[in-house]
Amino acid sequence: MTINVKQKLGDLDLDMNVDLPMQGITSIFGRSGAGKTSLINILSGLTRPDEGYISLGKRVLYDSTNDVFLPPEKRRIGYVFQDARLFPHYTVMGNLHYGCDHKDPQHFNDIVTLLGIEHLLNRYPSSLSGGEKQRVAIGRALLIKPDMLLMDEPLASLDLPRKQELMPYLEMLAKEVNTPIVYVTHSLDEILRLADHMVMINQGKVVVSGNVNSVWGSLEMRPWLPAKEQSSLLTARVNLNHPKYALTQVMLSHNAYLWVSRVNQERGEWIRVRIHSNDVSLTRVKPEQTSIRNVLLARIDKIHIIEDDQKVEIKLRVGETHLWANITLWAADELALKVGDEVYAQIKGVSVTKDDLA
């Protein structure tokens, strides 16, 4: 999807120029007021930008130069709002069929089963939990067979138990539904669990975009992460299980591997691992007889000094991937680190979550 639009919204000057992939989940991330919801309202056709161009695949949705503007009902885009917006006088069945101008019983059954709402079909919205309402809203959006699904902070209005109830269904959506999803959120946890791609926006502008691993590990993202969330995301391939201990070896490249807690995936499957920057220390000499199980040879790509905190952020290259380490200014001076140096990264902890997303 190609987006190049401008719009004046009160004090916000929206100026977006970005390409979104046509597969997987793309997270739109930013603080409140950054322009996240304004962007997807433009994509859906609910609002018209002042100028620009939008295409979805080969279809042009908006072109100010040629006076093209497809209304929402002709865009084939599903939209799930923060609040479910179900019709209270319709049953779940009635809500699911509303706006669906084609009948495909198999597609209906597949969506209902995927979202686990078979037992809700004859109930009314007033009897549903917040998580159940959102599942119905997602089902309604998917039943029109959209070319793209927009989700505007679908968990924001839910309490923690309802979020935990809905999250597994969103994870299944990411795996089972062959529809690109644009997912607006300000939750780092949701990004880590769901997103394949990421666009970070601030004050109506795109700050950085790309694969979620690369954006998460970018220098632009660092100021947005709380100290406890400063980390790297790496994609690794499952290799083997340790014959004695509950550990699995995963490969980052042909000569770089990590030991992680035992996973259920088969050899050759890909998983995502997360390494906190504060769990990475550096040494110029390969350590011996150490309790740390994961030691990687790395090359320093960037050195970012934060004088106020007496801290240094080091971006390391390990094969084709990157890893961040936070060390003290004292340690950096004593090791006399500079860009291009080879060092050994000692990794105290590596996490892998239950659904391959760290």
Swiss-Prot record:
Short name of one Pfam family: ABC_tran
TM stretches of this protein: none
Protein topology in the membrane: Peripheral membrane protein
Main location: membrane
A Gene Ontology molecular function term of the record: ATP binding
GO CC terms, sorted: plasma membrane
Domain (ABC transporter) ranges: 3-228
Binding site for ATP: 30-37
Protein localization: Cell inner membrane
Key words of the record: ATP-binding, Cell inner membrane, Cell membrane, Membrane, Molybdenum, Nucleotide-binding, Translocase, Transport
Top-rank taxon, per record: Bacteria
Residues of the Mop domain: 289-356
Similarity annotation: Belongs to the ABC transporter superfamily. Molybdate importer (TC 3.A.1.8) family.
Cited function: Part of the ABC transporter complex ModABC involved in molybdenum import. Responsible for energy coupling to the transport system.
NCBIfam families: modC_ABC, Mop, PRK11144.1
Subunit relationships: The complex is composed of two ATP-binding proteins (ModC), two transmembrane proteins (ModB) and a solute-binding protein (ModA).
Protein name listed in UniProt: Molybdenum import ATP-binding protein ModC
